Swiss-Prot record:
Highest taxon of the lineage: Bacteria
NCBIfam families recorded: PRK13694.1
UniProt GO molecular function: DNA binding
Family the UniProt entry places it in: Belongs to the UPF0335 family.
Name the UniProt record assigns to this protein: UPF0335 protein Nwi_0989
Length: 89
């Protein structure tokens, strides 16, 4: 026998379950897309390496291009200062 309280909670519970399932499925789909994109990026780096490019330098350039110009300049200045202090420049 279903009580009145249980009958009222059933649609809410069903909605919550459906919503939770949809969220989980979206996350799983996005994780798969992320893996595919990651594999594609790895392939591009492998291609670049095959063409004679230095992958480490390419990764550094990509990381630097993501930075704000002022932040990048500040990091370069600090690096130069340290290198100069160590007699590397």
């Amino acid at each position: 026998m279903v009580t009145a309280v249980a009958a009222k909670e059933e649609p809410v519970t069903s909605f919550a379950k459906d919503q939770l399932r949809a969220i989980i499925e979206r996350i799983e789909r996005l994780e798969e897309e992320k893996k595919t994109i990651s594999d594609d990026i790895r392939d591009v780096y492998a291609e670049a390496k095959g063409n004679g490019y230095d992958v480490k330098a390419l990764r550094t350039i990509v990381r630097m291009r993501k930075q704000d110009a002022n932040e990048r300049q500040e990091q370069e200045t600090i690096l130069e200062t340290y290198m100069h202090a160590l007699g590397m420049l």
